[in-house]
Amino acid sequence: MKIHEECGVFGVMTKEPANVAMMCYYGLYALQHRGQESCGIVVNEDGLFHSHKDLGLVNEVFTGDVLSRLPRGSIAVAHTRYGTTGATNRRNCQPIEVNHQKGHMAIAHNGNLSNAAALRSELELSGAIFHTTSDTETIAYIITRERLRAPSIEEAVSRAMNTLDGAYSLVIMSPQKLICARDPYGFRPLCYGQTEDGSYVVASESCALAAVGAKFIRDVEPGEILVLTSEGLCSRKEHCESRERRLCIFEYIYFARPDSVIDGISVHAARQRAGADLAKTHPVCVDVVVGVPDSGLDAAIGYSQASGIPYGIGLIKNKYIGRTFIAPDARADQVRIKLSPIRETVEGKRVVLIDDSIVRGTTCGRIVRLLREAGAKEIHMRVTAPPFLYPCYYGTDIDSQENLIACHHSIPEICQMIGADSLGYLPVGHLHCLTGHSHYCSACFCGSYPTAIPQGNSKSRFEQRLSERDGALTSFRGYD
């Protein structure tokens, strides 16, 4: 089992009408790793919104025929989703569109609100009717409520930020503007750049800017609101520095693509540093260093360089497996379908295996078994994340301690359960080796949450309540 991140957001503002849908398509492709459940694009054609969104991967949802039906425009927003609140159905696909007395908007969101349940209850008591089970709709309602009293959409967003707690990187489109905002803690990444023709591009990661030929300008600061119009860019920073930065450290460990740079730090380099630290804190006498594709590869190189032990490609990932159907009674075989060992690398050798995390322990146990079947003499597991001990409320699917193996077993017990000869985790106190500073969120490892978490609150309970209500909702036709 791997931890999943909620989603990726993308937006574009051009000086003249252009094929912005295709730009979003390329941007979503670059962000596909952030969400594989659904995706969507909304194009602004002279104030009229045209959208398409559905369940599936980017290339499944946006065929050539679909893209040809989306008009040219000067603004567009896009989203790729892995749901951490809200069921997997078409109603929860983003971007979400909202009509109100002063106009309309489309919103794409990465993250989770830690006060979503309380805000939703408050809104329902005041008469709000929800069409989704996603907390993104709660954000949309809060912004809409403020917009009815505010002189501009950006002012409404600023006022809404006084109410929202938790993680949110937002890209919002109105008839005339593209607005992006990042929560004051900066839990989730957000950056922007510019193409040669002057078009602005906003994305969760810098790799998506490169995918459309945009030059990276900078990250959106925690608490910052960027307003993009046909006349240029304006920055509002009234919420900046109201909180201490707390970017999710797991962005560097696993979520982000290695070719991205987040808050000035190369993801590729951060993973190599984590591997090098593991070589110092958990040395072992072996013959070869092997990384688990994909995020374990950079760390394995770092481990090899720091230890002097040769690096070898010991596992090959099937890049074409996609969302292949696997029968429920054959789930144990899915690792064999996704990964294949290279016998020549591991046979008769002592192997140190580098991976990014252990959640339930089932996947890494099967990988260890694969390598043993390929002839590995010893397998020593090294992990670039500390043990997961606490739920995450800021945009991942770790919703309780129930499925976290480290909550129920000691490290020696886990080592025995996965079948390794030894097991070593990156110490919590060494997480700064990834970033060079301590301004990050590591609540899932240490239980120290930057925001207030209501007593007894859990995303699973919130999800259950919304899902029960979801069964009573009428069918939703969408905006296509």
Question: Predicted regions span which residues?
Answer:
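Amphipathic alpha-helical
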Residues: 141-151, 293, 301, 305-323
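Short, glycine/charge-rich flexible loops or terminal/linker lids adjacent to PRPP-binding catalytic cores
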Residues: 308-352, 361-362, 390-399
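Conserved short alpha-helical segments that host acidic/polar catalytic motifs at enzyme active sites
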Residues: 1-222, 227-286, 292, 378
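PRPP-dependent phosphoribosyltransferase catalytic core
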Residues: 161, 176, 213-219, 240, ...
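Flexible loop/turn segments at secondary-structure boundaries
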Residues: 84-85, 115, 179, 187-188, ...
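Extended, hydrophobic alpha-helical segments in both membrane/secreted and soluble proteins
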Residues: 289, 296-303, 307, 311, ...
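Secondary-structure transition/capping motifs at alpha-helix termini
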Residues: 128, 149-150, 283-287, 305-312, ...
